């Protein structure tokens, strides 16, 4: 991908978001597709005054898009337990973690992980966590 292709593609995304009142100023975080980036993508993102972000690995939260027919499939229960186990075993818990969840997943994935969010939020709140938006986390 060239620099111009990257900038053009990103601008097309912002043009579409503008229809919903979302601007580059209000949405200045960039999570690359498939969480893949290199030094060029990082530099181009910075040139566009955007903040490159990525999820924190280790919890399997990013596997919520997988479907049962895939080799790397993880059920919502597996993902939920992985997050809980990580929180319990890691000395710092999940402080500062960015969990990635997909609101749009394949129809073949019937156990949508976002359906477990109320359980996860309740668990984390009982452990004393305060959930914040990414712009608050990265101030």
Where are each of the predicted segments found?
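Catalytic domains of cell-wall/extracellular-matrix polysaccharide-remodeling enzymes
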Residues: 1-100, 104-125, 130, 136-138
């Amino acid at each position: 991908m060239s620099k111009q292709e990257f900038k053009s593609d990103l601008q097309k995304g912002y043009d579409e978001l503008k229809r919903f009142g979302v601007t580059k100023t209000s949405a200045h975080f960039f999570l690359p597709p498939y969480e893949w980036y290199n030094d060029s993508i990082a530099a181009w993102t910075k040139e566009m005054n955007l903040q490159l972000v990525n999820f924190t690995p280790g919890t399997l939260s990013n596997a919520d898009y997988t479907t049962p027919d895939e080799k790397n499939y993880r059920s919502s229960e597996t993902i939920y337990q992985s997050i809980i186990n990580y929180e319990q075993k890691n000395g710092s818990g999940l402080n500062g973690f960015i969990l990635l969840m997909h609101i749009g997943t394949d129809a073949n994935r019937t156990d949508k992980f976002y359906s477990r969010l109320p359980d996860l939020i309740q668990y984390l709140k009982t452990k004393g966590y305060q959930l914040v938006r990414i712009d608050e986390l990265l101030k």
